Amino acid sequence: MAIEVRPATAFADVKTMVGPKRPDANVCWCLSYRLTSSKENQGLVGPARGKRVQQLVRQRPPPGVLAYDGDEVVGWAAVHPRADTSFARNRKVPHVDDLDVWSVWCIRVRPGHRREGISHHLLAGAVDFARSNGAPAIEGYPVDNKGAKLDLTMAYVGTMSLFEQGGFAKVADTDSVLNGFPRVLMRLDLR
């Protein structure tokens, strides 16, 4: 298995990774944090959510990276400048300085491909993507689960251990809690 991580420019593959099973569903598409306006997020319903993601995929930079095993898409990581996300105004996640930092907030591995190290490839790919687009630093907001089992539906934020293994360091606590675990701010300087 040779995993390759590429910018998310193929809408069909993004849809495979984060699109809902029902086209009229009002969930996922990895938009909740990507959109800076909660009003826009709540106003996008059903197929309009997918159309918005289709627009984002055509923009430069695209909204994240995809992992492939050969021609098969097996993973997704959302990564973009923090200023273009809801983290720009999030009161629970602190800003530690004024750098134009990038954020990685969702790491998703396709069922049937979990426990193969793909999340590590995705995080490394997100770092490379941010660096190639001029990011001075990249940060994530994983849970500090201290090795305890994490509900699979909440694992999308990653774990502190994953980010540490990717070279990130904890720089701050947050006021955010997910699945009963505190989230921490992890950062990697890219300068």
Describe the residue ranges of each PLM region.
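Conserved beta-strand edge residues that scaffold enzyme active sites
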Residues: D71, D144-N145, V177
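Conserved acyl-donor/pantetheine-binding loop and adjacent beta-alpha core of acyl/acetyltransferases
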Residues: R58-R60, Y68, E72-R110, R114, ...
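C-terminal "cap" of GNAT-fold acetyltransferases
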Residues: T153-G166, A172-R191
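Conserved GNAT acetyl-CoA-binding A-motif
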Residues: L123, A130-A155
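Conserved acetyl-CoA-binding loop-helix of GNAT-fold acetyltransferases
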Residues: V104-V109, R115-S132
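Conserved N-terminal entry element of GNAT/NAT acetyltransferase domains
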Residues: M1-S38
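A short helix-loop-beta-strand connector motif used in the catalytic cores of GNAT acetyltransferases and
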Residues: Q42-L66, A83-S86, S103, F181
